[in-house]
Amino acid sequence: MAANKSKGQSSLALHKVIMVGSGGVGKSALTLQFMYDEFVEDYEPTKADSYRKKVVLDGEEVQIDILDTAGQEDYAAIRDNYFRSGEGFLLVFSITEHESFTATAEFREQILRVKAEEDKIPLLVVGNKSDLEERRQVPVEEARSKAEEWGVQYVETSAKTRANVDKVFFDLMREIRTKKMSENKDKNGKKSSKNKKSFKERCCLL
């Protein structure tokens, strides 16, 4: 399932987001709520579904590409390929299921392994189903402490009420954008340094 691409989108900045987490935590529900303002409770798990949407990020029109990966163990072997293509990750668990929170550590390790050559990977930890407070198994402080340990932001969401749904996608896009700008600056700096060195060498030869 994918959102239709419109003409002229190719020239816009594109930010690639990967949804990661155990099965049944609400990754698809969050994605569909963000894409279409719809709450879908029952969703058939697939290997991966890709979505693309044009949004305005801090006054700039950009595209977000969302890959919603299946959390089931059956798909663990192909997850590496999806992770390689991602620029930022929403690491999702359900606050009503402590096991899904514990699993985030393994998913994070997999991301770090696949993206080992990169310095800081844009990543947010997302505690979904905040509307089910009475069934909470993961204390806010426990989740926040883990996120702080990893040096990332922790946000609680509800795909049902749409609480913080836009926030997590937009905050992650900002992190991706910052990383890209930093990398471009580094590349330009190295290029400039190389050109200066080349110029000096030519001067010496004259």
From Swiss-Prot:
InterPro entries: P-loop_NTPase, Small_GTP-bd, Small_GTPase, Small_GTPase_Ras-type
Lipid modification (S-geranylgeranyl cysteine), residues: 203
Record annotation: effect of changing residue 48 to W: Impaired abscission, the last step of cytokinesis, as shown by the accumulation of bridged cells. No effect on cytokinesis. Decreased interaction with EXOC2 and EXOC8
Result for mutant: residue 23 to V: Impaired cytokinesis, as shown by increased number of binucleate cells. Impaired cytokinesis. No effect on cytokinesis. No effect on interaction with EXOC2 and EXOC8. Decreased interaction with EXOC2 and EXOC8
Post-translational modification: Prenylation is essential for membrane localization. The geranylgeranylated form and the farnesylated mutant does not undergo alternative prenylation in response to geranylgeranyltransferase I inhibitors (GGTIs) and farnesyltransferase I inhibitors (FTIs).
Effect of residue 46 to A: Reduces the binding affinity to EXOC2 effector
Pro-peptide positions on chain: 204-206
Molecular function in Gene Ontology: ATPase binding; G protein activity; GDP binding; GTP binding; GTPase activity; ubiquitin protein ligase binding
Pfam family, one: Ras
Any one GO biological process: positive regulation of protein binding
Modified residues (Cysteine methyl ester): 203
Effect of residue 46 to S: Reduces the binding affinity to EXOC2 effector
Keyword set includes Heme: no
Main location: membrane
Motif Effector region, chain ranges: 43-51
Keyword Cell membrane in record: yes
Catalytic activity: GTP + H2O = GDP + phosphate + H(+)
Ways its activity is controlled: Alternates between an inactive form bound to GDP and an active form bound to GTP. Activated by a guanine nucleotide-exchange factor (GEF) and inactivated by a GTPase-activating protein (GAP).
Stated role: Multifunctional GTPase involved in a variety of cellular processes including gene expression, cell migration, cell proliferation, oncogenic transformation and membrane trafficking. Accomplishes its multiple functions by interacting with distinct downstream effectors. Acts as a GTP sensor for GTP-dependent exocytosis of dense core vesicles. Required both to stabilize the assembly of the exocyst complex and to localize functional exocyst complexes to the leading edge of migrating cells. Required for suppression of apoptosis.
Subunit-structure text: Interacts with EXOC2/Sec5 and EXOC8/Exo84. Interacts (via effector domain) with RALBP1.
Protein family per UniProt: Belongs to the small GTPase superfamily. Ras family.
Name of the protein this chain belongs to: Ras-related protein Ral-B
Gene assigned in the entry: RALB
